[in-house]
Amino acid sequence: MAVDSDYVTDRAAGSRQTVTGQQPEQDLNSPREECGVFGVWAPGEDVAKLTYYGLYALQHRGQEAAGIAVADGSQVLVFKDLGLVSQVFDEQTLAAMQGHVAIGHCRYSTTGDTTWENAQPVFRNTAAGTGVALGHNGNLVNAAALAARARDAGLIATRCPAPATTDSDILGALLAHGAADSTLEQAALDLLPTVRGAFCLTFMDENTLYACRDPYGVRPLSLGRLDRGWVVASETAALDIVGASFVRDIEPGELLAIDADGVRSTRFANPTPKGCVFEYVYLARPDSTIAGRSVHAARVEIGRRLARECPVEADLVIGVPESGTPAAVGYAQESGVPYGQGLMKNAYVGRTFIQPSQTIRQLGIRLKLNPLKEVIRGKRLIVVDDSIVRGNTQRALVRMLREAGAVELHVRIASPPVKWPCFYGIDFPSPAELIANAVENEDEMLEAVRHAIGADTLGYISLRGMVAASEQPTSRLCTACFDGKYPIELPRETALGKNVIEHMLANAARGAALGELAADDEVPVGR
């Protein structure tokens, strides 16, 4: 029996809002995260609560919406809403979600607006009356072509008041449609070879948990073991938190099916590993492990290499919490300059669905960080941050530290200059908004960015140094946001950005062909 995702959403129904407009300044000027997925098959366990805790561990990967789907062998039940995991779920809701298999999702939008309809897991009924729920981390580069296919099969609405507009919903629709004539597992094996882009999926029916990873393995996905079941998660830290032991990474191009018969593994594509190097720099939790490499250890090593590449005389090294802290520790260890905690972070500042007032917006970074004046007053500071995107955050930070008494500010960045947008699951700004694109010449660019943020000196780690710190071969990493070398060809519709499906549905509602921009032509992505 399939149960629609509206089933337990009375509390949410009154707040099916679209979040648009300006986000707080600190969110606009950082690389914005992607999503987190979690799944568990464990008869006899409270799978809804395990999923809740797993999503808590993955909250850093997406703060716009959260959802959980559970099944007990007879029905699939989905609850989702806008907000943080702790805001969406309470004890009463979790207690109502009984079953032996569950998936969960925390969302940051990379395709589709922030609406209730676009929250995940997405849900679809099959023609056989069963249910399919799906969660997705990543971004599809052929979403428009898949949407055209779904529209032609009558699977997506173009004129209803608020259709879902994500590549994830398209995948859910096509999976459910394929399962009408075969098993869900076979439907996935038929569909996945036609999907292009970065994707880690968890999906389920009434009895079985499925998980898969795209052939490039752009985003991480791991398998863990419970005493009475199995867990899959975007990061190994989530396995630790729910008490699961790490088994292995799910391989690029691999589909897992987990049920009473155990774990089945099937290859749907040959692997061509291209893991996102930015996971090591910023996206992943420091207590996670990716491809056998500790994220924390990688960040500390980046800091050491940064100290060797960009030395400077100073009195104190401080990190911009949280992701800049391990690199700052490594910089201090290598340089011999003492490390200190110079900035306090407000742990309760996150993304908000309340539009900030002009007064609050002007506070900017002060809402998030505050200097320890007694630590930094009179000091020559080395300030280590994970990345520079637009530069507004670093400009405000430098100004704040000078006002607090720092006499020199030497900014060091634990990643190379970001010059290219990401089409594989990170919501970077357009090329024109990236500060490192202001000047073509590398030396002139460095001076222009230094001047723009107001630092005394500025240094970035080299691409070679960052890659070496990951301990992964360059050939197995995606570094496109730094060098423009995209491992997955980009169709024409990628120029439409995250609202590609909204754009195409609007065209369809006006009578235009849904697939007219779905050509598979590779297009150059300029700065």
Curated annotation (Swiss-Prot):
CDD domains in alphabetical order: GPATase_N (cd00715), PRTases_typeI (cd06223)
Gene Ontology molecular function: any one: magnesium ion binding
InterPro entries per the UniProt record, alphabetical: GATase_2_dom, Ntn_hydrolases_N, PRibTrfase_dom, PRTase-like, PurF, PurF_N
UniProt propeptide residues: 1-34
GO biological process: 'de novo' IMP biosynthetic process; purine nucleobase biosynthetic process; purine nucleotide biosynthetic process
E.C. no: 2.4.2.14
Name of the top EC class for this enzyme: transferase
Cofactor(s) listed in the protein's UniProt record: Mg(2+); [4Fe-4S] cluster
Ligand binding (Mg(2+)): 323, 385-386
Catalytic activity: 5-phospho-beta-D-ribosylamine + L-glutamate + diphosphate = 5-phospho-alpha-D-ribose 1-diphosphate + L-glutamine + H2O
The entry's keywords: 4Fe-4S, Glutamine amidotransferase, Glycosyltransferase, Iron, Iron-sulfur, Magnesium, Metal-binding, Purine biosynthesis, Transferase
Active-site residues, as the UniProt record annotates them: 35 (nucleophile)
Listed pathway(s): Purine metabolism; IMP biosynthesis via de novo pathway; N(1)-(5-phospho-D-ribosyl)glycinamide from 5-phospho-alpha-D-ribose 1-diphosphate: step 1/2
Cofactor binding mode and count: Binds 1 Mg(2+) ion per subunit. Binds 1 [4Fe-4S] cluster per subunit.
Presence of keyword Zinc-finger: no
Region (Disordered): 1-30
Every Glutamine amidotransferase type-2 domain range: 35-261
KW Magnesium (keyword) present: yes
Domain of life: Bacteria
Family according to the record: In the C-terminal section; belongs to the purine/pyrimidine phosphoribosyltransferase family.
Function: Catalyzes the formation of phosphoribosylamine from phosphoribosylpyrophosphate (PRPP) and glutamine.
Entry protein name: Amidophosphoribosyltransferase
Species annotation: Mycobacterium tuberculosis (strain ATCC 25618 / H37Rv)
Recorded name of the encoding gene: purF
